[in-house]
Amino acid sequence: IEPVRKDVVAHTLRLTPDELAARLLEGFDGIAFDAVRSTDGTFDAHRTRMGAWIYVSGSHACPDCVAGTEGYWRAAWKLPWSAACVKHRRMLASDCPACGSRFASWRRDRQVQPVYGYMVPEAGRCLNARGGGTRGHRTGPCDHDITTLDTLQLDPSSPVLQAQAWVDVVLEARHVIIAGECVPAIQFFRILRGFSALMLYAATPKEIIDLVP
C-alpha cells in the first residue's frame, strides 16, 4: 500500500499508519525479513520475496480463527514459520479443497489486491477465483466454507505446538533469549532460514522423519 493510500486506510479504520502496518505482512520488516521498498517508501512484496521467505500470494489459515462474525486472518500466516495455531491447538490449513489453490491466492496476474474488491469478505469463506471463466469475464469466488476443514489436532505437549509458541513469542517480542544472550528476531530468523534451507537441500526424508518425536 502506498504511503498516501495507507494514511487514508488507517484513518478509515481509526488506526495510526504504524498500527495499520503492524497488521500487514510488511509489519514483520526488520523482524522476520528485510523488506525492499520503492523510492516512495512503498513495501515491494515481489522484490522482497526474492531474498526473503514470505507468501506474497496465498496464506495458511486456522479454521477456528476465521469462524464467525469476528473471524480474523493473521498476517503471520503469510510467513513459512507459521504451521500451527497455538490458541486452537491444531495445524493450519494451506490449500482450499474446492478450488485447489492456496487460501487468499486471489489473483493470477501477480497483483496483490483482492479480485472481488466490491465484495465485503467473510473471513470464513474462500475468496479465490474459480477457474473456467471466459476471457474478460470473471467467475464468482470459490466461496468454500473454510471453517469445515479438518486439520490435525495437537496435544498440548506436542513439540510442534511448543515450537510454534516459541516462534510466535519471538515475532511478538522482536527478540529471543538464547544461552542467556538477547538475540534480535531478524538474526534468529536468518539462522532459522539457513538451517531450514540446509535441511531441505541435504537431508533425506528418513533423516527428517527421525527428528520428529
Predicted feature locations:
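C-terminal accessory regions
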Residues: 1-81, 86-213
